[in-house]
Amino acid sequence: MMELITELFDEDTTLPITNLNPKKKIPQIFSVHVDDAIEQPGFRLCTYTSGGDTNRDLKMGDKMMHIVPFTLTAKGSIAKLKGLGPSPINYINSVFTVAMQTMRQYKIDACMLRILKSKTAGQARQIQVIADRLIRSRSGGRYVLLKELWDYDKKYAYILIHRKNVSLEDIPGVPEISTELFTKVESKVGDVYINKDTGAQVTKNEAIAASIAQENDKRTDQAVIVKVKISRRAIAQSQSLESSRFESELFQKYESTAANFNKPATAPLIPEAEEMKIGINSLASKTKAAKIIAEGTANELHYDYKFFSKSEVDEVSEKIKDVIFNAIKNEPTTSIKCLEKYAAAVNQFFEEYKDNWLDKHNKTRKGQPDEVWGEITKNAWNAAKTKFLKRMIYSFSGIGAGPMIDITIACDGSKYTPSQKRGIREYCGSGYTDINNLLLGRYNPERYDVMSEKEIESAINNLDSAFENGDRIPEGITVYRAQSMTAPIYEALVKNKVFYFRNFVSTSLTPIIFGRFGITHAGIGLLEPEARNELTVDKNEEGITINPNEIRAYKENPEYVKVQIGWAIDGAHKVNVVYPGSLGIATEAEVILPRGLMVKVNKITDASNNDGTTSNNTKLIQAEVMTTEELTESVIYDGDRLMETGEVVAMTGDIEIEDRVDFASFVSSNVKQKVESSLGIIASCIDITNMPYKFVQG
């Protein structure tokens, strides 16, 4: 049976691995992406002081290496191993691929993995057999396994690899044969060892195996976890991967340099900065927007809803204009805060006409029982109000952002070099799909849209150069984009409150997520809680709704369920961006954020709704750009607290830092943002249906 297992095993089946501390000269802390669960197994490479429980990082000159498995939790912390995922054998294959590379590169003579048999899904022996085959096939006969260690312990499965031409007892870090367990006896055939408990004679390798197990049985994985340094960026990278991807050499090359473009801005402020601020903050532009919206709304309420006579249109228009202007006068017209206040005002004055609507609606009643008619009326009113609010927010999103479009049309991108302009034009044109697919690990050289791998490499290099030259937009500007995200990645985002963009991030200076490029599909997210709860369908701010007809597919493959996200991103002024202007499609008012960007999630709002068609799993996410200066790359965690309480407490030497540190709070701002309750109504106005794909891809 065991031979059959090894014959069926594909030794090329390795899983995606992320180095969780890229700063280390010798990579030694890794996560392994085994499936789409939000918790993933990982492993640490380390060494121990002889005979003790004290572990340390590998360094040049070490000859004995230990592999310690762990679990990377949804919050990005390290905990005791919970399991190896659905395929323990593929996990072991991936681990020993890294181990063999490390041993060869750093001339390590021995390596040992110890794993609880209870965590192997009953495949402990298969794992040992597979490891044996891998070592024999990949080491060219230079390394062998100490099989005498396989069955020594009922609790642990041991795998020890050592260089074939080096005696185990001569390797620093391998314990001497225990005099507590064995008596050494000289004989004509050499030294033999007698087991003190049984009196049986054993081979030297059996004595070494027993001594190794005796020493390591006393060691705890907890001691390894206590002071582990991990990179928050690397964790976010590992948890933003989808299961199906093509990790080419170029993917790995650009992944390794992504952090270079997340540094604090060095570019000068764009010449249009003051004009932008005036355009969205001036009372004149707000008065104009309020007047245009009010005139259109008054006519709609008269002609479409018949709420009042034609002679009253001008009076109602003036009233609506005052309501809107008073709501938005203190906020930039493209900000979430402005849209939120606008949505609350619109909702309020539409409610004033509810009695008019009910009078008309009740005339359509055809003898239904009161209970049935009440439910019909409630649903019809909610649908009518939802449609109205979505149209209103759609209109304001375009009109309020008008100055941004005019300014972008006049921008010529003259600061960029010819090669940088070429990269920008290729990206803003039809090349963005292939460019971002490569950065996302989705590019297939046999099936691409318009650009070959060589052309993509040139385009990315030109774009990277453009970001180094770069633009800096003024502070206080919100940029918008959308994204369709798989359920596992979204769940990791919810837990971590941080998201990592591998690709170049197309955003707009206008609130395009509320329907600029199509019919508004999700319009109720900006409302205050009472009104939002009346209109949303998921009733779930951060969670995912699985419809009954999706349950089976979701269980088989969690990536089946998608979450539609509208991003409202602040803080883009902190990093160099590319403002294409006329080098792109100027009416999109595009701002390209750099690849490798990390954002902190400040707020997630349920944007689901039903205006006749149900839209589940739509979220408005307010986020903030985090630079490398704001993001501490690694910390030392208190493993005792972590495993006992789930808290991730940072340590400095032997002194705990007082503030609790975890992925829900590590990037929290000094100033807590107060999110108005009417946010819900605007969130549900999110529409990514007909949006250009570059504003969605990710």
UniProtKB/Swiss-Prot annotation:
InterPro entries, per the entry: ADP-ribosyltransferase, Phage_T4_Alt-like
Modification after translation (UniProt): Proteolytic cleavages at the N- and C-termini by the prohead core protein protease give rise to the mature enzyme.
One Gene Ontology term from the biological process aspect of the record: regulation of viral transcription
Keywords: Glycosyltransferase, NAD, Nucleotidyltransferase, Transferase, Virion
Entry's localization field: Virion
TR mART core domain ranges (all copies): 375-628
Coiled-coil region: none
Reactions performed catalytically: L-arginyl-[protein] + NAD(+) = N(omega)-(ADP-D-ribosyl)-L-arginyl-[protein] + nicotinamide + H(+)
Top EC category: transferase
Any one Pfam family match given in the protein's UniProt record, by short name: ADPrib_exo_Tox
Site (Cleavage): E7, L8, E633, S634
EC code: 2.4.2.31
GO cellular component: extracellular region; virion component
Active site per database record: R481, S506, E590
GO molecular function, one term: nucleotidyltransferase activity
Function: ADP-ribosyltransferase that efficiently ADP-ribosylates one of the two alpha subunits of host RNA polymerase RPOA on an arginine located in the C-terminal region. ADP-ribosylation of RPOA alpha subunit enhances the transcription of viral early genes. Also ribosylates RPOA subunits beta, beta' and sigma 70 and performs an autoribosylation reaction.
Family to which the UniProt record says this protein belongs: Belongs to the Tevenvirinae NAD(+)--arginine ADP-ribosyltransferase family.
Protein name as it appears in the record: NAD(+)--arginine ADP-ribosyltransferase
